[in-house]
Amino acid sequence: MKRRFQRKMNRLCPVTFGTFHAVYFAILKHAYNYSADNIAREEQRYQCMREIIAKEHLTYEDETEFITSLLGEISLVKNSGIEIANYYSKNCAETVFRKVYRQYHEFLYKNRLIDFDDMLVYTKELFEQRADILAAWQNKYRYILIDEFQDINRIQYDICLLY
């Protein structure tokens, strides 16, 4: 899309192209001095979940499948804006899932890490709590074009409404 736009314009234009995650991570970099080192790597996330599962004595048939499913549920909770108290896990008892969710969040927080879902959650929180920062980004991006708008999730939609 960026190349097509540049070819049609035949000149440099002050237009930013990026995914939600790329744009929101850039915002968080400015606000919190994050770098790529602050993004939790897949192996860090899986190792964290292995430790939580062992600590909670959870049973499963296939470890990788179980962890993937739990991380998927954590992602669903973050992306939909559901309160953790109102979410019912498909993988384990609700009280256990809440512990897993909380411990996963604590691991990220203690290690100053964020996952891709946090990029959305933290940007939304930042904009809601800091009107000055929201205004600065509104001035930078006067217009937003979202490709495949029908595919965005709740938190992406909520952030767009803040603009």
Regions found by a protein language model. Name each.
Residues 1-72:
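Conserved P-loop NTPase-based nucleic-acid remodeling module centered on helicase motor cores
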Residues 13, 35, 39, 60, ...:
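Short, flexible active-site loop motifs that bind/organize anionic cofactors or intermediates
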Residues 27, 39, 52-53, 67, ...:
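Weak global preference for isoleucine
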